[in-house]
């Protein structure tokens, strides 16, 4: 982490695609192609101010409880204290709206989502600064939790 510029942590929901999304109509029904959902912690940063991207992604255990997604609440703890919170519905309706948009864009680009692809929602809260030694845990109601420890 020492060489990274402004590393930060975000909570996302990840979706495992279980079936190819071959047309726009199928893209509109995420229950037909989402095999599982899971909590994700994403460490974002770069080597300079102009370069930024995913540095690490930690994935929690998958759940097939797709019905919890609309009301998914997330809390992010840093070193045992809540530092951010958000809900799935705050990301323009349900988190499923994000995967529908991605599926439609991929179809328009003739690069359909396929079985085994993983799609992340947008962050469920503002990104939080990370320092070496920090321990982060995110809990997503109905989906579970995942932890990371930042090292030098």
Residue ranges and their predicted role:
Residues 78-79, 121, 141:
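Short strand-turn-strand beta-turns centered on an Asx-Gly dipeptide
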């Amino acid at each position: 982490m020492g060489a990274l510029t402004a590393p930060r942590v975000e909570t996302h929901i990840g979706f495992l695609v279980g079936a190819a999304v071959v047309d726009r109509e199928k893209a509109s029904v995420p229950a037909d192609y989402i095999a599982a959902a899971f909590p994700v912690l994403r460490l974002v940063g770069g080597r300079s101010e102009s370069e930024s991207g995913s540095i690490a992604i930690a994935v929690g255990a998958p759940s097939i409880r797709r019905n919890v997604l609309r009301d998914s609440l997330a809390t992010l703890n840093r070193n045992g204290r809540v530092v951010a919170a958000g809900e799935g519905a705050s990301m323009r309706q349900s988190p499923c709206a994000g995967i529908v948009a991605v599926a439609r864009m991929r179809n328009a680009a003739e690069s359909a989502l396929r079985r085994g692809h993983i799609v992340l929602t947008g962050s469920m809260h503002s990104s939080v600064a990370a320092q070496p030694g920090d321990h982060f845990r995110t809990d997503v109601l109905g989906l579970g939790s995942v932890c990371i420890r930042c090292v030098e």
